[in-house]
């Protein structure tokens, strides 16, 4: 029953309804052509050089590059931080970093990041099943205790970072992961929360090539 305002008028109904799962109900997906992919020939030389290098290595251009290239300054900032987190030195293996991306992106319902980074995870792990298992329910995936602890921490950062407590850090420490490792885990989860939301908001879709990689 609608409530009334101070002057007896019916209060406006909320514009957003919650589903049974507690998430806002959804309309049609964002059309990808609202933010079209950039034309390679129109980009600054440094962006073109990076994208061509990716194309030569992968055999195709992942859509994230051409979508973000619409704004060159943001492209540079995004990939500088991405590279620092995902390719820099640190206590986490490359596969562990990709697991974080897949698990937290699944929580955020980001099709692009789950599919794209799931492909990379399959390659690093040499396991055609692992990405699906981590995305659907990592707690049931055949993972070592260290990986499970990493994903527990990462998913808590993704869903309820204010609830993190000393016990969360202590559990990581039990698996040889100190405060700096926890920083890395949190940084990846937080960075990809940004990536997930931009992918969803821009209508970014995974390239078909990703689905076949590592199978």
What are these regions (language model features)?
Residues 2-215:
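Hydrophobic alpha-helical segments
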